[in-house]
Regions:
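General small-molecule cofactor/ligand-binding pocket signal
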Residues: 1, 71-73, 165
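Loop-to-helix element that buttresses phosphate recognition and phosphoryl-transfer chemistry
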Residues: 1-56, 99-111
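Short amphipathic alpha-helical segments
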Residues: 14-15, 59-63, 139-142
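Phosphate-coordination/substrate-recognition cap region in phosphate-metabolizing enzymes
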Residues: 33-94
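Glycine-rich phosphate-binding loop signature in dinucleotide/nucleotide-binding domains
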Residues: 41-43, 117-124
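A polyampholytic, Gly/Pro-enriched intrinsically disordered region
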Residues: 88-101, 165-168
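Generic beta-sheet signal
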Residues: 122-132
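Domain-level recognition of soluble alpha/beta enzyme cores
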Residues: 143-167
């Protein structure tokens, strides 16, 4: 199961976050607590998260509520958005040139992380807390619609025969 982190002030302000280490805001912490309550019946075996504060904090709130330790993996990070980082969406509307991490490299990195998690936890229920762009890359890899994914959006999926597949 993959989930996008809960809300930050930069989400609320519609700012590009990328690798910026922006913490959750109060609403984000409340969202993470609600997510934990919703996932209580899932009997998770493990929780893995991006090392960026917004994903790590989301995972830690869920983990503390469910009694599951969080393992951090930097390969689950959001795409590096280059010079867009910290700027609002409207500020970059007329900046067509992308100077961040290539989408292909981001997809490779996130797939590598998910594959490693699946190999460490065969036949187990794992929650992976990551970012909207990371979830988008996985959807694109499968030829699915690439979002957008709101904060705390959960995507039920499984790793089978060396590949990720959606469950819903």
């Amino acid at each position: 199961m993959l989930v996008r982190h809960s809300e930050t002030d930069w989400n609320a302000e519609r700012r590009w976050q990328g690798h910026a280490d922006v913490p959750l805001n109060d609403r984000g912490r409340e969202q993470a607590q609600r997510l934990a309550e919703e996932l209580a019946a899932e009997k998770l075996d493990a929780i893995c998260a991006s090392d960026l504060a917004r994903a790590r904090e989301t995972a830690e709130i869920v983990g503390a509520t469910l009694g599951v330790e969080v393992v951090v993996d930097p390969d689950l990070r959001e795409i590096d958005v280059g010079s867009r980082q910290g700027r609002t969406w409207s500020e970059v509307d007329d900046q067509p040139e992308w100077d961040g991490e290539p989408h292909e490299a981001h997809a490779e990195r996130v797939l590598r992380a998910v594959r490693a998690i699946a190999e460490r936890h065969p036949s187990q229920r794992v929650l992976v807390v990551t970012h909207g762009g990371s979830m988008r890359r996985l959807h694109e890899h499968l030829g699915l619609d690439g979002g957008p994914f709101g904060n705390c959006t959960v995507w039920a999926c499984a790793w089978e025969n060396g590949s990720i597949r959606p469950l819903d």
